[in-house]
Amino acid sequence: MEQILKYLQEAHPKPDPLLLELEDHGRRDGIPVVSRETGRLLSTIVHAMQATRILEIGTAYGYSTLWMALAQPRIGRIWTIDPDIRRTEIALSYFRRAEEDDFIEVFNTPALELLENFTHRNLDVVFIDANKAEYRAYLDLAVPMLKLSGLVIVDDCLSDLDAMRSFNEYFLNHPDLDATILPLGNGTGIGARKR
């Protein structure tokens, strides 16, 4: 599998230089970022859907945010949530350098607290990559915010099977989603809202 991943990384064009810099920054600071493959998947989905209304739960340094922002139409909007102001200040510096800061709104508050009062609906994409213990609650609050056929994408579904097993079963059997989990990165769940 390592050989296949190496081949794919070499076959793809190099990501935007800011993304490479951000990968390195996260690695140096010990801040986890999604895999490059997951970033490419997010970018491809956002581009294919021409997604203009995206909610991200878990910003960190903004690596996944930037993958989506660079693929999004210039009329789009990303709302991203992370209570850690120090990390989101770093993210904002990269958004400014990429000239994407006008299209991204950062909320420094606990995600569940914000989601309970979040007024935006008909979202194209919701990306979840935050506190794993709260994944189910995030999902329950986020699915009704999606437009019909909108996507919820979940990172780290296979990172710790014992910890994620219950959530994964809930996600795959969610009555409002047509969902699957791909062995991409640390496991990427994708669910389309069907009702």
Spans of model-derived segments:
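A short alpha-helical cap/connector motif
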Residues: 1-125, 132-153, 157-195
